[in-house]
């Protein structure tokens, strides 16, 4: 009999708690939408302070890494920029995207594919591209949209940067 009374008390308590949650406004317990900062770089390996490299000083990236996600087993899908980035942004392997060269635009091969940034947009996020995500010709296309995918962004910014403004230094073998 005591066990039955305990079960009834627990059931009554759970009912009150459940009623409280059902009566609460729908959004009041929703998790706050996280900010997402996605950085993608050409030719960047794990020679960074945040990965324990003793010589490389990368304090800004290290601070971001402390609060974010560091990948320890992430591998490039292809030895060229265009196919690798298309793979990363779609979640498909290069043989699935059929983008095996740099001069191929994503929508030429995959007109209906959903990019990672489009998925964020569908969830109510702003997806802003600053600089290069998909391939573009260097140095000719620096500061332009290049082979970008306009469907993937709510806004774009195309900075020229030092690789364009100091082009002679970039392509020089002298320090």
Residue ranges and their predicted role:
Residues 1-11:
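N-terminal secretory signal peptides that target proteins for export/translocation
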Residues 5-7, 18, 146:
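Intrinsically disordered, low-complexity regions enriched in Ser/Pro/Gly/Gln/His and often acidic
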Residues 13-25:
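Bacterial N-terminal signal peptides
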Residues 27-175:
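Formylglycine-dependent sulfatase
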């Amino acid at each position: 009999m005591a066990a039955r009374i305990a079960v009834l008390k627990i059931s009554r308590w759970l009912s009150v708690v459940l009623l409280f949650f059902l009566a609460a406004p729908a959004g009041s317990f929703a998790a706050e939408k996280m900010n997402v900062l996605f950085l993608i770089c050409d030719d960047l390996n794990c020679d960074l302070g945040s990965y324990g490299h003793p010589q490389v000083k990368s304090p800004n990236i290290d601070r971001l890494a402390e609060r974010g996600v560091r990948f320890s087993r992430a591998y490039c899908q292809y030895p060229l920029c265009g196919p690798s980035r298309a793979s990363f942004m779609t979640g498909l392997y290069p043989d699935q995207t059929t983008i095996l060269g740099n001069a191929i635009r994503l929508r030429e091969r995959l007109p209906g594919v959903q990019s990672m940034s489009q998925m964020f947009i569908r969830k109510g996020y702003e997806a802003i591209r600053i600089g290069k995500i998909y391939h573009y010709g260097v140095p000719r296309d620096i500061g332009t949209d290049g082979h970008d995918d306009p469907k993937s962004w709510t806004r774009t910014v195309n900075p020229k940067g030092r690789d364009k403004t100091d082009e002679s230094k970039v392509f020089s073998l002298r320090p």
